[in-house]
């Protein structure tokens, strides 16, 4: 591999106001690649960007559109937030002018197909990261993401055929990066002979401030146990399960922090809280920038962190809670059981079982101080093995294998 590589990262959306796992991964990957002496750039649509958004050395934003008619603003915004498959010709002209050595795709659909075709024309390898999963997206979640397209004329299907973009990008890229062993296994079965790699997300350890006193405060609390969930307010994240827990366990309070990507679901949460009469122990904060003082304060105040998702390809925020020494309860789904081991460094529960979350909560609350200390110590040790420098070093080896085989 040359000493310095020009790396084009293709991203569908990138905005602190609507942050998520993909943005976190790309941000840290680019920072580590720059530290290694490479030249990474982020090429992104202008989805969710304010009109005065300005490019930087790391990122450029480009016009885009969804090829459906009609496309009212409300539906475009829903697609921007989740599930959209846009065209962005200007984005790929800029990538072509950049002349990258590697194209790293962090999107699916039309952006992925266009990136694969451009990599072929430039004779450079393409790597595709499946941040949102591909083999294990629930049918109900897929249907909800596609709801804004209902009743619209898909003129893009004609354009796709004319441009030769009706193909499966996973079958054409030089390497696929999965963030869970479950998806890795399924894709290797579905795409035999393809270069498919398990590469987990990382955690920015220097930014974490582990609180060794969490176990003591949990055992000797003169107040309700403070439960925190930081994730998008979205049906995928299953925060309604936490609202039900709040009603069943009067010894806890609940704070939800995250950008609202499904307004109807946020409304449903608020309505259920009012119906249950638990508003005095509930708070919803619709999004805090990563690294902000307010977000750090929310983590610092938490006694327990819960991630109850029904679909979770990885779950970076669970690692962040573990690194901070916050006792963790997580759904036994997707990439979470790859690093959360029940009873050892956290508690797992089956999200399809209505009573399982309450049982996991009770198991955690019943642990003696020594047991909680062991749990959080093991959690911090787990998080330390997911440092970004190590993860990006492994990614660069994947690039090297692709370039050597190109």
Enumerate the language-model features and the residues they cover.
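Conserved acidic donor-binding segment of nucleotide-sugar-dependent glycosyltransferases
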Residues: 342-343, 347-354, 363-369
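Membrane-proximal helix-turn-helix segments that form the acceptor-binding/catalytic region
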Residues: 121, 134, 152-175
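Nucleotide-activated donor-binding/catalytic signature segment of Leloir-type glycosyltransferases, i.e.
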Residues: 267-289
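Aromatic "clamp/platform" in nucleotide-sugar-dependent glycosyltransferases that forms part
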Residues: 310
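Carbohydrate-associated surface elements
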Residues: 182, 202
């Amino acid at each position: 591999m040359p000493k310095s590589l020009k790396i084009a990262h293709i991203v569908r959306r990138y905005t602190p106001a609507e942050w998520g796992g993909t943005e976190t991964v790309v941000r840290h990957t680019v920072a580590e690649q720059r530290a290694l002496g490479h030249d990474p750039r982020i090429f992104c649509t202008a989805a969710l960007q304010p009109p005065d958004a300005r490019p930087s050395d790391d990122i450029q934003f480009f016009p885009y559109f969804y090829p459906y008619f009609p496309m009212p603003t409300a539906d475009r915004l829903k697609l921007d937030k989740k599930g959209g498959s846009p065209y962005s010709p200007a984005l790929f002209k800029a990538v072509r002018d950049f002349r990258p050595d590697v194209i790293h795709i962090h999107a699916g659909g039309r952006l992925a197909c266009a990136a694969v075709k451009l990599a072929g024309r430039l004779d450079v390898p393409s790597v595709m990261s499946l941040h949102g999963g591909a083999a294990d997206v629930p049918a109900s979640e897929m249907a909800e993401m596609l709801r804004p397209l209902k009743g619209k004329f898909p003129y893009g299907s004609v354009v796709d055929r004319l441009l030769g973009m009706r193909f499966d990008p996973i079958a054409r890229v030089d390497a696929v990066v999965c963030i869970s062993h479950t998806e890795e296994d399924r894709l290797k079965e579905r795409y035999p002979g393809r270069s498919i790699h398990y590469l987990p997300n990382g955690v920015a350890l220097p930014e974490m401030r582990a609180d060794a006193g969490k176990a003591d405060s949990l055992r000797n609390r003169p107040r309700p146990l403070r439960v925190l969930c930081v994730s998008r307010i979205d049906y995928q994240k299953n925060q309604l399960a936490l609202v039900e827990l709040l009603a069943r366990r009067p010894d806890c309070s609940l704070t939800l922090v995250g950008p609202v990507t499904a307004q109807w679901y946020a409304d449903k949460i608020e309505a259920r809280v009012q119906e249950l009469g638990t508003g005095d122990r509930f708070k919803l904060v619709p999004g805090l920038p990563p690294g902000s003082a307010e977000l750090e304060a929310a983590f610092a105040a938490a006694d327990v962190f819960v991630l109850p998702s029904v679909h979770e390809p990885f779950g970076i925020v669970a690692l962040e809670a573990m690194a901070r020494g916050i006792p963790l309860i997580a759904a036994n789904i997707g990439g979470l059981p790859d690093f959360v081991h029940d009873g050892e460094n956290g508690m797992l529960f089956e999200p399809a079982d209505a009573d399982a979350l309450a049982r996991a909560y009770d198991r955690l609350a019943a642990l003696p101080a020594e047991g909680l200390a062991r749990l959080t110590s093991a959690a911090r040790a787990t998080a330390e093995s997911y440092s970004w420098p190590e993860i990006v070093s492994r990614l660069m080896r994947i690039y090297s294998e692709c370039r050597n085989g190109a």
